[in-house]
Amino acid sequence: MEERCFRLGIKTNYKKEIFMILNNKQNKTEFIVSKMDELVNWARKGSLWPMTFGLACCAVEMMHSAASRYDLDRFGIIFRPSPRQSDVMIVAGTLTNKMAPALRKVYDQMSEPRWVVSMGSCANGGGYYHYSYSVVRGCDRIVPVDIYVPGCPPTAEALLYGLLQLQKKIKRSRKTLYWLQK
């Protein structure tokens, strides 16, 4: 029996289709897991705890973004002093060859899931010191980077925009559902 769908104006047998979809056990499991993923991602994106890894002048702009004018606390972003308490690392400034092992060690100490934000042209690709013998040409050679914030130094608004983009990326992730399908 066909029934009319009021929103689309299309005739469909939607009751039978929904029953067929929910009758399958795997579809029920995927539905529950996807809703659980949405709930977990909602909690994760609303409580980002970044750890600062300030290496140069970009760190001043990072401190500026945490001050009262931009107030990252209203987005649930609270800076943490320890890598074991944080889930986001903001790399701000010129990364030297001598500092690269320390960056990797701090990254490894962070608990899963963890994200990295590369802030400024020096952290993104070496910046003005790109051709220097002692500079790593981008922190993505040491740790996997999720968000790049351009600028020299980037403004506090740019960092805020980058962190909001990271929240959108977290909202779209489906780690549990992918794990279930393997």
UniProtKB/Swiss-Prot annotation:
The EC number on file is: 7.1.1.2
The signal peptide annotation in the UniProt record is none
Q: Where does [4Fe-4S] cluster bind?
A: C57, C58, C122, C152
Q: What does UniProt give as GO cellular component? A: mitochondrion; respiratory chain complex I
Similarity section: Belongs to the complex I 20 kDa subunit family.
| Pfam (any one) | Oxidored_q6
Annotated source species: Reclinomonas americana
Reaction equations catalysed = a ubiquinone + NADH + 5 H(+)(in) = a ubiquinol + NAD(+) + 4 H(+)(out)
Cofactor(s) recorded for this entry are: [4Fe-4S] cluster
Under which name does UniProt file this protein?
Answer: NADH-ubiquinone oxidoreductase 20 kDa subunit
The entry's free-text remark on the cofactor is: Binds 1 [4Fe-4S] cluster.
Provide the GO MF annotations for this entry: 4 iron, 4 sulfur cluster binding; metal ion binding; NADH dehydrogenase (ubiquinone) activity; quinone binding
Q: Name one GO biological process term.
A: mitochondrial respiratory chain complex I assembly
First-listed, main subcellular location of the protein, grouped into a coarse class = mitochondrion
**UniProt keyword annotation of 4Fe-4S present:** yes
**Per its UniProt entry, which superkingdom is the organism in?**
Eukaryota
NCBIfam families xrefs: nuoB_fam, PRK06411.1
Report keywords, A-Z: 4Fe-4S, Electron transport, Iron, Iron-sulfur, Metal-binding, Mitochondrion, NAD, Oxidoreductase, Respiratory chain, Translocase, Transport
Intracellular or extracellular location(s): Mitochondrion
